Amino acid sequence: MPKRSFHWLLVAGLATGTLWPSNDPFVGKWKLNPSKSKLTDRMKVEVAGPNKYALDVGGGVETIVADGTDQPGLSGTTVSITVGGPDAWKIVRKKDGRTLVTGTWMLSKDGQTLTDAFRANQQDGSTLSLDYVYKRTTPGSGFVATWESTSEQMNSVVEFQIEPYQGDGLTFVTPAAHQTLKLIFDGKDHPNVGPDVPAGSAYSARRLNERTLEITDKIKDKVTNTQQFELSPDLKTLTQTAHPADQGAANILVFERE
């Protein structure tokens, strides 16, 4: 679940010293076009003991007893698994008692398909709604298997705004998440900040050209994600292509200028 949260953890780095003016082409308000976007997700469930499971839903393995109680998870969060039957699980992640995300998992009758109603609570009180369908890619019983997404449906409006910052910098503003990220073009690693940010999280980036940014995310010096943001020649479309380290395929998000 952590990897499917929509974070705009960006900074831009520039080794050449060239400056972009305040009329940077990235500046503007951007809205996700779900019909042109493609999200690919992979998750793994293994048996770790009696009624105990090792989950890897992005970011690392968490071992959880499926008894409905909150148990220690990654990055200071807690995770609970509530079993609603052989074909139904509810997974809830919290931070400091506040629910961050909820995943309602359902198995098909033949056990080959998993649907996940993924809901992420935003800082402004709204809910990000995303429905995934997965196929089983390894043998297993019930939810125990490796699962790879085959389709997704975004049910929420996703918007963010890019503003100038200190001459050649940029500020990314995500209103629903109450996130304001100030980007400095110095080519150095910078710590991520915020209440829900994993410990040891950092990012660095560079401009490949005037229409493309490349950003690398790390946790404790380990690369977790590399992504590019590329503007179309007419500057009306912004395409984010993300390559999570634990995924074989890229996630592609297409935004249109408002």
Pin down the residues of each PLM region.
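Intrinsically disordered, low-complexity peptide-like regions
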Residues: 5, 21-22
